[in-house]
């Protein structure tokens, strides 16, 4: 997910994680983020059977890519790794605020009103369009140490979790955009192919 939510991000709750990489610095070589049109983005992700140092290093590499691209969320399929792993940091400019790592996340329930907000994505840079999503989500997952966790989130955190979890199923936020005119116009403006969008119900 891309940084078009700065005001909302400042109101976000603190996140807990021990996987840290430097923020606000030039990032070392990091995995390439695939963009709309890449088949890598459409492949479903597989569950991670064992949480180990290799998984933690992947999370660090994803964070480096995310920070370098000025994003607030990234899913493993976006860097061509088809495993169920997400990293989120709603306050990427605050060094003391650790990122959130979600391994094998599962939605327990969604609730609250259906809200419409503008979203962006590091895999579709420059495109920002309105998407309707539930305002609250209850998600269970394992953290970077393999411990089971459960989290209830609302606002930007809920939206970011839902956005990134879509990537694990090969779904992009543009697949959920209902304003066809705006969608086609934005994609054309930035050189993306409208035919690469796969609408979901």
From Swiss-Prot:
Cited Gene3D superfamilies: Peptide deformylase
Source species: Synechococcus sp. (strain RCC307)
Entry GO MF terms: metal ion binding; peptide deformylase activity
Name of the protein in question: Peptide deformylase
Region (Disordered): 1-34
Organism placement in taxonomy: Bacteria, Bacillati, Cyanobacteriota, Cyanophyceae, Synechococcales
Binding of Fe cation, residues: 121, 163, 167
Catalytic activity: N-terminal N-formyl-L-methionyl-[peptide] + H2O = N-terminal L-methionyl-[peptide] + formate
Pfam families: Pep_deformylase (PF01327)
BP GO terms, sorted: co-translational protein modification; translation
UniProt cofactor note: Binds 1 Fe(2+) ion.
Protein keywords: Hydrolase, Iron, Metal-binding, Protein biosynthesis
Signal peptide: none
Family annotation (SUPFAM superfamilies): Peptide deformylase (SSF56420)
């Amino acid at each position: 997910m891309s940084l078009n939510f700065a005001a909302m991000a400042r109101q976000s709750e603190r996140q807990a994680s021990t996987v840290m990489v430097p923020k606000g610095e030039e990032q070392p070589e990091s995995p390439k983020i695939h963009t709309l049109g890449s088949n890598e983005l459409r492949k479903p992700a597989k569950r991670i059977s064992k949480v180990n140092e290799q998984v933690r290093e992947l999370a660090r590499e994803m964070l480096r890519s995310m920070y370098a691209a000025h994003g607030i969320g990234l899913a493993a399929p976006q860097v061509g790794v088809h495993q169920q792993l997400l990293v989120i940091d709603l306050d990427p400019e605050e060094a003391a605020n650790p990122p959130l790592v979600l391994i094998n996340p599962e939605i327990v329930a969604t609730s609250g009103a259906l809200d419409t907000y503008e979203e962006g994505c590091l895999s579709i840079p420059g495109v920002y369009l309105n998407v309707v999503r539930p305002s609250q989500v209850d998600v269970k997952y394992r953290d970077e140490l393999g411990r089971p966790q459960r989290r209830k989130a609302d606002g930007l955190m809920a939206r970011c979790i839902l956005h990134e979890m879509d990537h694990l199923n090969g779904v992009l936020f543009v697949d959920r955009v209902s304003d066809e005119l705006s969608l086609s116009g934005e994609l054309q403006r930035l050189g993306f192919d409208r035919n690469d969008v796969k609408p979901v119900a």
